[in-house]
Amino acid sequence: MGVTKKPDLNDPVLRAKLAKGMGHNYYGEPAWPNDLLYIFPVVILGTIACNGGLAVLEPSMIGEPADPFATPLEILPEWYFFPVFQILRTVPNKLLGVLLMVSVPAGLLTVPFLENVNKFQNPFRRPVATTVFLVGTLVALWLGIGATLPIEKSLTLGLFSIK
């Protein structure tokens, strides 16, 4: 490594940078080539070696072995498709289900036009965007949990009954 230069606090350039909050990297070791050529590859190769070692020493199965003669009772999609699956499962008309799925990104595209986002950075000062996010998250969680239940309990999550 190189010789580390001590900061001179009487230096006017350093004082100006410190006043702006930019003086932390003015003196000391440079990031190039010390960090980028020597330290980062060691960290990356060490991470790969640790993952490879764990995979060799403690292999884990990725699901059950395939059995073509045993079909599951209910076939479910991957977890990230649960809300879409629930919409298609509960809506009786296929066209209406597809329109509901298309309305989600279409509704999200209208949010910037409903509210001036450049004006405020705090999410609590953007009530439309915050409300759309919170309601969308709750609906997605509700639909995702409901997709794992039988169709009779899927809309209410079994909390109450609809007759």
Curated annotation (Swiss-Prot):
Keywords: Chloroplast, Electron transport, Membrane, Photosynthesis, Plastid, Thylakoid, Transmembrane, Transmembrane helix, Transport
Organism domain of life: Eukaryota
A biological-process GO annotation: photosynthetic electron transport chain
Gene3D superfamilies listed in its UniProt record: plastocyanin oxidoreductase (1.10.287.980), Single helix bin (1.20.5.510)
One Gene Ontology term of the molecular function aspect: oxidoreductase activity
UniProt xrefs under CDD domains: cytochrome_b_C
Subcellular location: Plastid, Chloroplast thylakoid membrane
Pfam families, sorted: Cytochrom_B_C (PF00032)
Primary location group: plastid
GO cellular component labels: chloroplast thylakoid membrane
Residues passing through the membrane, by range: 36-56, 95-115, 131-151
Membrane topology: Multi-pass membrane protein
Family, per entry: Belongs to the cytochrome b family. PetD subfamily.
Quaternary structure and interacting proteins, as annotated: The 4 large subunits of the cytochrome b6-f complex are cytochrome b6, subunit IV (17 kDa polypeptide, petD), cytochrome f and the Rieske protein, while the 4 small subunits are petG, petL, petM and petN. The complex functions as a dimer.
Its job: Component of the cytochrome b6-f complex, which mediates electron transfer between photosystem II (PSII) and photosystem I (PSI), cyclic electron flow around PSI, and state transitions.
Protein name (record): Cytochrome b6-f complex subunit 4
Origin species: Pelargonium hortorum (Common geranium)
Lineage: Eukaryota, Viridiplantae, Streptophyta, Embryophyta, Tracheophyta
Gene responsible for this protein: petD
